[in-house]
Amino acid sequence: MDGTGLCSYTYEPYEGCPYKVSKNGNKTWQAYAIEAKLVGANGFSISMMSCWLENSENMDAKQDCELKAFSRLAGELKKVYPRLPVLLLADGLYANQTFFGTCLKNDWHFIVTFKDGNLKTVWEEIGLLRPLHPGQKLDRVKEKNPVRGWLSEQLQYINDLDYAKYKLNWVEYKAWYERKEPHEYFSHLTDIRMDKSNAWEISRHGRLRWCIENEGFNTQKNGGYNLEHKFSRKNIGAKKNYYELLQIAHLINQLAEKLLHVKEHLKNCKVTLVALWEDMMACMRNQTIDNQELNQVMEEYKQLRY
């Protein structure tokens, strides 16, 4: 679960567009959406549902924000997928009672980034309990890189931390190569109780949140999808329509690009993904597709592996 700014304006592009006021009094309006994406270790970042930030017509009401949009999106997600097992990954903005309560009410698990300064009482409890749980501090050497040397990993976890009416579990992860500094550092809170058998896996799942930003938003902004382009400067309906079509296109491309045999083809033929798509588009533009042959292909049983 994460949000992103799509484009900014020096004028109000549509009614209800959120805005910020700078120190010198200048207003900047920004189209902003929050996304529920399905992410995986293989790089998938597939949009499941979107929600836009839009201010109320009531001028006295506070502006819409990402946390308010999350509550609306969570309600819709539960309504559409009432029995779907869900593990929500979210950044440090979501480490609050509203998020924890929503997950508990919907019977969802969560792993949320835990930043310094967030939930100070929880950090204080962690500081007190750290020395008391030496058996919950784990180390391992995972692999050797020919340039950077051995990769060392260290993890520590603590269960049953009290925050308001919630029981939280904390995990901290550090990783470094012997010839590279500084080390990687991640800290997460989760409702899933940990032990030596699952602590590494919980931390790894928490770090997959980066797929939303990297394989998701960053690819759509800088990978040819033109997410931030102002195709419509005044019509929010047109902007939303393009956004939804973009998510569908990105989904189709991911399902094609991440096939194992496509990856092997790119590796063996030393062809870039961009070049492969350009060749395919050129082929479709210049060749007539035979309906009989197409139907024959559609009727064949295929198993896709990722």
Region locations from a protein language model:
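Active-site rim beta-loop-alpha module in soluble metabolic enzymes
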Residues: E184-D195, T219
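An internal, acidic/charged active-site-proximal segment
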Residues: S56-E172
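Extended recognition/assembly regions associated with phosphoester-bond processing machinery
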Residues: W170-Y173, E181, E215, N253
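Short amphipathic alpha-helical "interface-anchor" segments enriched in bulky aromatics
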Residues: K196-F231
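Short, conserved catalytic/metal-binding motifs centered on acidic residues
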Residues: M1-L6, A36, F70, L88-L93, ...
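Active-site-proximal, Lys/Arg-enriched surface segment
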Residues: M1-N42, S47, C51
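Short, structured patches in soluble enzyme cores that scaffold and shape functional sites
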Residues: L38-G40, W52, G92, V112-D116, ...
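A short, flexible helix-boundary coil/loop motif
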Residues: Q136-L155, K221-N241, L245-Y306
